[in-house]
Amino acid sequence: MKINTLPTLSALTLAMSLALGAGMATAQEQATGNQFWWPEKLNLSPLRQNAIESNPYGSDYRYAEAFNTLDLDAVKKDIKALMTESQDWWPADYGHYGPFFIRMAWHSAGVYRIFDGRGGAAGGQQRFEPLNSWPADNVSLDKARRLLWPIKQKYGSKLSWGDLMVLTGNVALESMGFKTFGFGGGRVDDWEAEMVNWGSEKAWLDNKRHNGKGELAKPMGATQMGLIYVNPEGPNGVPDPLASAKEIRDTFGRMAMNDEETVALIAGGHTFGKAHGAHDPAKCVGADPAAAGIEEQGLGWKNKCGKGHSEDTVTSGLEGAWSSNPTKWTMEYLTWLYTFDWVQTKSPAGHIQWTPADGKAANLVPDAHLPDKRHAPIMFTSDIALKADPIYREITTRFLKNPQEFELAFAKAWFKLTHRDLGPKARYLGADVPAEALIWQDPIPALDHPLIDNADIKALGNKILASGLTVPELVRTAWASASSFRGTDMRGGANGARIRLEPMMNWQANNPKELAKVLAKLEKVQKDFNGSLKGSKKVSLADVIVLGGSVAVEKAAKEAGVVISVPFTPGRMDATQVQTDVNSFAVLEPAADGFRNYYSKDSSLSPAEMLIERANMLNLTVPEMTVLVGGLRALDANSAGVKHGVFTDKPGVLSNDFFVNLLDMSTKWRKSDKQEGIYEGQDRNSGKLKWTATPVDLIFGSHSELRAVSEVYGAQDGQDRFIQDFVKAWNKVMNADRFDI
């Protein structure tokens, strides 16, 4: 008996301990974090997100290499077969998952926004909070991704979730008779939720992001918390088509879409599928995936009404289809938009939508699951907007008369939607990449000449140093060029030398007057040097600008007593003004750049927070950011040559003086009574003014974590480490956009 009883008691004890443990874990209060006690403390977390340690594939994994081993046609064949393999646990509308997967791909890519380049399909962020649990717009997309798991499981590390979701959207379109423009792979998956400012609201679908004039705050891309773009029922649920059109134009514009692309996307996308609002969500639908019980295994929005799916499905609360054949590419969306007069009605869930006034339309649309049931077509307020707005009306009527133009416009707009955050074409992978270069891809001419060798590089560097340009001028210019890069959507950077073109040449942070002088001298050096080269070898101005900064850093290090070589890899090319969309590049202009101690009135955050934002855009770590700020101050690289933070008596020399003097207790700091936002460092004994600084400078002595790093570089043995680390971080920024190396 004892032999049998002990395991039974052990099992019972285990079950009880698990049950009690679960209850105790729920009851235990969460520890109070530092952010509660010191809410104003500068948050460095953005510089630590998606660390390589979080990647289960490890540091040696190269996604591009893995992707290029795929048989892409075989992958697409598998995805296509999945389209019509309806699963009992989530049956396909009309027997085809195509429209469902289009919505998944669209809503994965559609959170992209131009002002900070965040959002988009790269990273596969739809898997993580908050996107995986956004109400209305992303309801049920957890099922779409779960349907794709067999495909992801089969191809594993060769196919990221980011690429799979977009590719599935493409295959869905093609399986329903639409010819897509192409597909480029290369979206590397993230392993945690990206830190994005989605808004300050504390309730879903709340709206506190408009000012008194009704203008949407930057960098927001959606009108309400938890939406992709606009409320389909109208602004804040008010069914006003013209007001809806205004919001559509703004939000789609913030995703880099013009009016024609916007119309093509809405009309093309709503050609397929249906909306789901069979019941009142408040009465039927359970918690979202993030809030659902552990037993739901990442699925949410459990529907307790009827079957819980099929004809009882609830997502947005709107109900119905836009065409009579929602799994085929047709012109019915536009045809019916103008054929019928549309009147307001409500879905079974009580949401405002529109149906034809003509009762003869009542049976045009088949039910998605019940063969003996038919319905009238529907439109959202955001659909009626395409007819009510004069500009959208001109485009929709033109598309209606010219189906081939509409089809091409949708194909190109869909391609742009799903690839906008992937960066330049050089990053695209796979056999389906279209040959055409598109202006929104920020094209750069292909390399068409032999590159200069090491001997040439040394000779060119000497020519630059002999040009009369100073170390600070060369460093400022190289930094201004390369630091325009942002890793959120892979735009900007030194390649292309767009710093000499509109609009970058006139950005205030770049000190246009000095920049023009420096570029003129560098262009002369380039011209003379290319004229001296034998054969067809050439060097671009983009390379000359970067090399100029690099040899300046070498010279500054040598004057500090350290001989070091700054790596340089030629191969950049020069873009033309024709290849540069001025309006598109305008959003890259920095409102602040703490590395240059530049801060404008257009900044949306404090100076220190804007520094973190800029460092995050450059994919820098905390130590990299710290060493770059200290080094650039020593090099006298501030915008417009301002002296704040230049804590050295030998500016232009790459010393660790910034850290030594910042940490010097003989200096007492006080707010300046002469200039707002500036601090004065006085000798603690005599009161004599020694230095001036901005909050960006002083944060490295005030913030406990940043001070800890600063102490490393300010120590007596810190000079060599400082120079070595500065050169590594400098080289990282200079090559941030070199996707070819």
From Swiss-Prot:
It catalyses: H2O2 + AH2 = A + 2 H2O; 2 H2O2 = O2 + 2 H2O. The record marks R103 as: Transition state stabilizer. InterPro entries: Catalase_peroxidase, Haem_peroxidase, Haem_peroxidase_sf, Peroxidases_AS, Peroxidases_heam-ligand_BS. SUPFAM superfamilies: Heme-dependent peroxidases (SSF48113). Heme b binds at H270. GO terms for biological process: cellular response to hydrogen peroxide; hydrogen peroxide catabolic process. This is Catalase-peroxidase 2. The lineage of its organism: Bacteria, Pseudomonadati, Pseudomonadota, Gammaproteobacteria, Alteromonadales.
